[in-house]
C-alpha cells in the first residue's frame, strides 16, 4: 500500500537503527516480522512503535550488558518520533517521490537529529566526544579524512598509551615471524572503510583489546563498555552514510550541524519542490474540487452525486498518467470513500477510508485530519471497535485527534456516541446506518440536519 511512500515510516526508522547497530540478529524473529510488516504498511500505531523500540533496540542492547545505552537509545527514538510526526502531519509532500524528498530530509532533518543525539550521549557520559564519533573531516599530511571507526580505534589506543602508526597491530599481538594475522587485516579494512565491522567482530576485537597488558595496567571501570559502545555508534554512522551517499556526504553534514545547528523551515523547502513540479499540484487542485463536491456539510441530491462521480472518474483517469501516480492516490481513495458512504456502501467505504488515511499521513498534510474524522465517524456508526481503537491511537501518534473527543477511549457501548459527537461538530450530513449491517438501504440512512455544526477547528 505504501510502496512509494515519500516519507520513511516509523517502523522503517526502527529497522534502519537496528540494522545500523547490527542488533537485529539479537532480536526475537517474531518482532522482526512485525517490524517488516509495519515498515511496508506505514502503520503509525503508537503502541506498535513502542513495542518495536523495546523488542528491536532496547532488549538486544540490554542483552549485550549495556543497559545505560539501551535506555538512552530507546528514549532518543521516542523523542525522534515526537519530532518527526509533526513534519509528517504538517508538511505536504504531495507529488514528491521518495528520491526527491529524501535529499531534503537527509540534509535538513536527519543530519541535525544525529548531531543532537551525539551531543546528548556525550552530555550523559556514554561517549567521550560527539566530534570523535563523527570522524575527522580532514586527514593529516594529505591523507583522506578518517572515518568514525578509525577515529574511535585511534582514540582508544591513544587514551591507554598504545598509540601507533599501525593501529591494527597495536590491538592484536603479532606473530613472531613479523607477519600480520587475519584479524589484523580485518581491522585494517574497517579503518579504511572498505568493510563494516559486524556486531560479533566488534565484540571480539573489544575482548582482545582489553586483554592486552597496556590496557589492563591503566583501564578504568566501564572502559570496555565504552569502547564497544563507541564502535557500535561509529559503525551505525558509517552504515547510514553509505545508504545516503547518493545525496551527499552525510558525515560532513553531521559535522556541520555539530559546529552550528541550523534552523531550517523544511516545510518551505518541500513546498518549493512541490510547486516546481507544476502539473501534479494542478491535479491535486482537481482532486480537492472533487472532494469538496462530496463533502458532508450539506445534503446531496442524486444529480449532484452523479456529477461528483463523473468528476471523480476524470480525476482518477488523469492521476493514472502521472509520472508519480502515488502522489495523489490518497486523494483518489478519499473521494471514493466519500462516494461509497453517500451510496450507502458502508463496508466498502470503511475499507477505503482506512487506506486513504494510511497513505494521506505521508502526503496530504492537514487533510489527513479530515480523513481521520470521517473514518472515526463511520467506524463509530458501524460499531467497529477495533477500527475505532486503531484510528484513535494513530490520531494520537500524529497529534491530529479532534480535541472534542478529549480522552474518550472506544468501548463496546460508545461507538455511536463518538460518531454523534463528530457528526455534530464536523459533518452534519454524514450518512449513518441505523443498523450495524455493512450495507443499509437509503431508507435506513439518517442525517442530523437539525444540528448546526460547531466551530470545532480543534
Residue ranges of each PLM-predicted region?
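Recognition helix of helix-turn-helix/homeodomain-like DNA-binding domains
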Residues: 1-5, 32-37, 173-198, 206
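DNA major-groove recognition helix of helix-turn-helix/homeodomain DNA-binding modules
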Residues: 1-4, 14-24, 42-85, 198-220
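A short, Lys/Arg-rich alpha-helix, primarily the initiator
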Residues: 1-24, 32-42, 103-173
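Extended non-catalytic scaffold regions that mediate assembly and binding
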Residues: 25-48, 71, 87-96, 123-144, ...
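Extended, non-transmembrane interaction/recognition domains
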Residues: 74-133, 177-182
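Disordered, low-complexity "stalk" and linker segments at domain junctions of extracellular
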Residues: 138-144, 148-156, 160, 186, ...
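Short C-terminal boundary/hinge segments that cap the last helix of small helical domains
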Residues: 210-240
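Extended amphipathic alpha-helical coiled-coil/heptad-repeat regions
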Residues: 245-452
